[in-house]
Amino acid sequence: MAAEDVVATGADPSELESGGLLHEIFTSPLNLLLLGLCIFLLYKIVRGDQPAASGDSDDDEPPPLPRLKRRDFTPAELRRFDGVQDPRILMAINGKVFDVTKGRKFYGPEGPYGVFAGRDASRGLATFCLDKEALKDEYDDLSDLTAAQQETLSDWESQFTFKYHHVGKLLKEGEEPTVYSDEEEPKDESARKND
């Protein structure tokens, strides 16, 4: 068949072989699409590692906030840290309060988990419910959760302990806050630093 093409076009066989690949690529719409996709992906891989130029983006992240000193919070005190009233975002999980400000895209006012900002998210995370109805305004003892829900909550707590700064605990009504010294570090964070 190649010999027939040579005879039909009157071209030298070496010219067809060298131009054949390019001819195939540029005459087939599918090949053009695949070539474009490869070029786009290569561009994203090479360009993706470079940070966006500052000042060009509307989504500029605010400068990082200083680390919050350890302290305990009542549910009412925690509500202030929702990313709107205060730029810092705190969430309570299983009685522990975490600073999730660096996860603003997830836990900020416009994020998918924004409903939990400044709140005790334990019940919502344990039951996979992202509605405000899953949240209580007062301390939630979580005693009515099933064993599976408690295990799910424990998994969430482990993830948050690993990823975010643990800043204190959520206080029950009438419970006195713990007085933390400036040098004191929680055990889980010192263990993380030794790894």
From Swiss-Prot:
InterPro entries for this protein: Cyt_B5-like_heme/steroid-bd, Cyt_B5-like_heme/steroid_sf, MAPR/NEUFC/NENF-like
Q: What is its main location?
A: membrane
Under which name does UniProt file this protein?
Answer: Membrane-associated progesterone receptor component 1
User: What keywords tag this UniProt record?
Assistant: Endoplasmic reticulum, Glycoprotein, Iron, Lipid-binding, Membrane, Metal-binding, Microsome, Mitochondrion, Mitochondrion outer membrane, Phosphoprotein, Proteoglycan, Receptor, Secreted, Steroid-binding, Transmembrane, Transmembrane helix
Q: Subunit arrangement?
A: Homodimer. Forms stable homodimer through hydrophobic heme-heme stacking interactions. Interacts with FECH; the interaction results in decreased FECH activity. Interacts with EGFR, CYP1A1 and CYP3A4; the interactions require PGRMC1 homodimerization. Interacts with TMEM97 and LDLR; the interaction increases LDL internalization.
Reproduce the free-text note on domains from the UniProt record.
The cytochrome b5 heme-binding domain lacks the conserved iron-binding His residues at positions 107 and 131.
PANTHER family from the UniProt entry: MEMBRANE-ASSOCIATED PROGESTERONE RECEPTOR COMPONENT 1 (PTHR10281:SF23), MEMBRANE-ASSOCIATED PROGESTERONE RECEPTOR COMPONENT-RELATED (PTHR10281)
Q: What is the gene called? A: PGRMC1
Which source organism does the UniProt entry give?
Answer: Pongo abelii
Q: Where is this region: Disordered?
A: 173-195
